[in-house]
């Protein structure tokens, strides 16, 4: 590398940098890149802000769930100011607002930029003015991007079918990558008195938590010896948040056990038998990757992102979306498997992770793509780069 290149990562929380991209950043630094991280400050900022090779820039205008055009304009101006000041060679944007307004700011500054669509979330879950507005903004932003990346084929198909982005300027990244060493399987324990099903995710409706609770009720009515556990943080400001009193009610009725929130999920996965995620839509869920890496069978909804990891009857099962009865059936199928079949299902799950979803593989893909992107000429007036 003749000159030291700089890469900027822009997102809505420092937590997401720490959780999903810290290994990638460390890898890029080891290859000679200098790194900028632009994100709001939170308790996770210190996990990376002092790393040699990282320059942290606090974003103060990021109002994640605000619908105010004034807030969005302030964010655009803040990003444009920083981009003109630091002049990175390439920018990666993550999450909706960073993608929308970061892409426009990067284009104005004439800096190549990639929008990474990590999942469509509740914004695209319904039909209404919000979805229509976001689609219009995404169409404009995607025109300004060098490339638009997705974590699954379904999301890419949605964007291209809606003509938000040209197919030739898209790329599917197979997830954020999992640490297969930290998430290493414990010895299989046959003959447990109860089968433990664990759901890891934010406490919001779109994770399929209501369906999980109803499935637990149905299985208990059948007399099955099960434990259903929920691990994740309350997302109180989210429009589809589940009220705390509902979780407390489920716990008091012993339908499920709420385990709270932790940054170290491995011990909880280790104690579980099967990881469940009946989510309505995902990018590529890390909870399933981490569970699979620890040789746990998977049960998830047949929805974008979730279906990517699961081979029916091989490493887990898919249930119909928003269908608690079908979820209960698939959980019952797993429950009744012989111990040897459960063990083999877990082995198959880890093998799939090792074959294509480790953090080392994802970092390698980034390195190849970055080399390619930086080699392209910038089109005058935008951050789009010719690739035709």
Residue ranges and their predicted role:
Residues 19-23, 195, 202-218, 325:
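A conserved mid-protein helix/loop that constitutes part of the nucleotide-sugar donor-binding site
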Residues 45-49, 157, 222, 227-254:
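Short, structured helix-loop element that forms part of the nucleotide-activated donor/catalytic region
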Residues 57-58, 139-185:
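Donor nucleotide-sugar binding/catalytic pocket of nucleotide-sugar-dependent glycosyltransferases
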Residues 93-99, 117:
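Short His-centered aromatic/hydrophobic patch
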Residues 261, 280:
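Aromatic "clamp/platform" in nucleotide-sugar-dependent glycosyltransferases that forms part
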Residues 297-300, 310:
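Short hydrophobic beta-strand element within catalytic cores of glycosyltransferases
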Residues 312-313, 317-324, 333-339:
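Conserved acidic donor-binding segment of nucleotide-sugar-dependent glycosyltransferases
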Residues 326, 340-356, 365-368:
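A short, well-ordered alpha-helix in the C-terminal region of glycosyltransferases
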């Amino acid at each position: 590398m003749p000159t030291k290149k700089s890469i900027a990562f822009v997102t809505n929380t420092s937590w997401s940098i720490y959780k999903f991209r810290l290994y990638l950043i460390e890898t890029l630094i080891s290859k000679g890149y200098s790194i900028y991280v632009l994100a709001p400050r939170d308790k996770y900022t210190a996990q990376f802000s002092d790393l040699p090779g990282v320059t942290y820039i606090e974003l103060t205008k990021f109002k994640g769930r605000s619908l105010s055009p004034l807030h969005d304009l302030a964010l655009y101006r803040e990003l444009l100011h920083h981009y003109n000041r630091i002049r990175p060679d390439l920018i990666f944007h993550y999450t909706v607002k960073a993608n929308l307004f970061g892409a426009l700011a990067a284009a104005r500054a004439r800096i190549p930029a990639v929008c990474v669509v990590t999942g469509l979330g509740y914004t695209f879950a319904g039909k209404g003015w919000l979805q229509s507005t976001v689609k219009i903004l995404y169409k404009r932003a995607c025109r300004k991007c060098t490339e638009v990346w997705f974590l699954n084929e379904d999301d890419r198909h949605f964007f291209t079918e809606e003509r938000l982005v040209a197919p030739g300027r898209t790329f599917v990244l197979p997830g954020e990558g999992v640490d297969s060493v930290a998430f290493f399987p414990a010895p299989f324990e046959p003959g447990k008195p109860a089968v433990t099903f664990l759901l890891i995710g934010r406490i919001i409706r779109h994770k399929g938590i209501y369906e999980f609770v109803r499935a637990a009720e149905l299985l208990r009515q059948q007399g099955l010896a099960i434990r259903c556990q929920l691990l994740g943080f309350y997302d109180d400001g989210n429009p589809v948040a589940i009220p705390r009193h509902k979780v407390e009610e489920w716990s008091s009725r012993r339908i499920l056990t709420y385990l709270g929130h932790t940054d170290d999920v491995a011990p909880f996965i280790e104690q579980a038998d099967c990881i469940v995620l009946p989510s309505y839509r995902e990018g590529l869920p890390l909870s399933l990757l981490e569970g699979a890496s620890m040789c746990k069978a998977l049960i998830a909804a047949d929805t974008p992102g979730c279906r990517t990891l699961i081979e029916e009857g091989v490493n887990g099962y898919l249930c119909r979306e928003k269908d608690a009865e079908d979820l209960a059936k698939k959980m019952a199928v797993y429950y009744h498997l012989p111990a040897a079949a459960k063990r083999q299902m877990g082995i198959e799950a880890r093998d799939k992770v090792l074959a294509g979803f480790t953090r080392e593989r994802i970092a390698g893909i980034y390195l190849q793509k970055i080399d390619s992107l930086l080699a392209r000429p910038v089109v005058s007036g935008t951050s789009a780069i010719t690739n035709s």
